Amino acid sequence: MATERDGGGCLRVAVSIFSIYYWLSALGHVFLGLWMLLDPKRNYILDLVHFSENDPLLKASAYVSLVCGCAQLLVGFLGLCGAVNRSRFLLLAFVMFLIGTFLADVAMGTLSLFYKDKFSNNYMGVYLKNLTYNRYSRDRWVLPLMDTIQFYVYSVKENVREIVKSKYGVMTSEPENKMVTEFIDKLQFYEKCCGSLGPTDYISSRWSQSTNQDSEEIESPLFPVSCCTQITGASALNPLAKSYARCQQIGANRQWRHAVGCSERLMSWFNEQIWIFVGFGFGSALTMMLGICLSCCLISKIRIYHVIRDDY
């Protein structure tokens, strides 16, 4: 007695094609998760909400994306093998994994939207204030985190401004001030911004006062080199101004010095990452729904026959 299967010819092709797409989607999930976690220009915003004590973390979206991608690389084989062999068991398992991926994608998009609203306006300021009062001395990891993320938050512009005015470029022998100075230089270099609200934040800052005292030049610098428009080959750790003299002029235009404050850039940066997660999450979820429907239709079309052959 032999077992034969037929049915669902076109659906087999459709599910096979979807399985290949599923692998590509898996690679996309892995890339997105690694990009958000490892890119030094992006991962600090994920750490921004890592201190939340009672709520889920935005960082969970990146990990969910990474885990889903790794799982999908394996699950894609189930769909392809199930379609080729007309195996109801493999296809059913594939559908169950698709449902799980669908729920994870929806969770990723929803969680991102949740944090977009949660940390807009003054909500982040409330979080920082609560963290400072209640946890600054209690949890050992909060102290260095708070010391370095005060200026990450676009909704507390005055805190950013205070850091620029009081800690940037002064007493860099102290680890905290050195770290703050390096970060602000990187932020201004990569995001093409200057200060918190604008270049004028550096006027009358402690950095400006210290350069006035230490400089042997006729005119001491008014703005950091990282605020200037850079030439080709410059880096965040070795900024090279297109025209340092013109950059230092009070009325310098955008051709020579960045005019936008970094708080505004951070707001755009944060929203960009949120919408990447939202678009990828919900877009992938819709595609998973298509795969679920195709696989279920193929399962219903498969016919199994038990053939008895008489051998003479």
From Swiss-Prot:
Keyword annotations of the record: Cell membrane, Cell projection, Membrane, Transmembrane, Transmembrane helix
Any one GO MF annotation of this record: D2 dopamine receptor binding
Tissue expression: Expressed in dopaminergic neurons, head muscles, vulva and spermatheca.
One example of a Gene Ontology biological process annotation: negative regulation of response to oxidative stress
CDD domains to which the protein is assigned, alphabetical: CD37_CD82_like_LEL
Subcellular location per the Swiss-Prot or TrEMBL entry: Cell membrane; Cell projection, Dendrite; Cell projection, Axon
Superkingdom of origin organism: Eukaryota
A GO cellular component annotation in the UniProt record: dendrite
Membrane-spanning segments: 17-37, 64-84, 89-109, 274-294
InterPro entries found in the cross-reference section: Tetraspanin/Peripherin, Tetraspanin_animals, Tetraspanin_CS, Tetraspanin_EC2_sf
Main location: membrane
Topological category with respect to the lipid bilayer: Multi-pass membrane protein
Family: Belongs to the tetraspanin (TM4SF) family.
Family matches, as PANTHER family: TETRASPANIN (PTHR19282), TETRASPANIN-2A (PTHR19282:SF555)
Its job: Protects dopaminergic neurons against oxidative stress-induced neurodegeneration. May act partly via dopamine receptor dop-2 to negatively regulate dopamine reuptake transporter dat-1 activity. Also plays a role in modulating behaviors linked to dopamine signaling. Confers protection against oxidative stress in the whole body.
Protein name: Tetraspanin-17
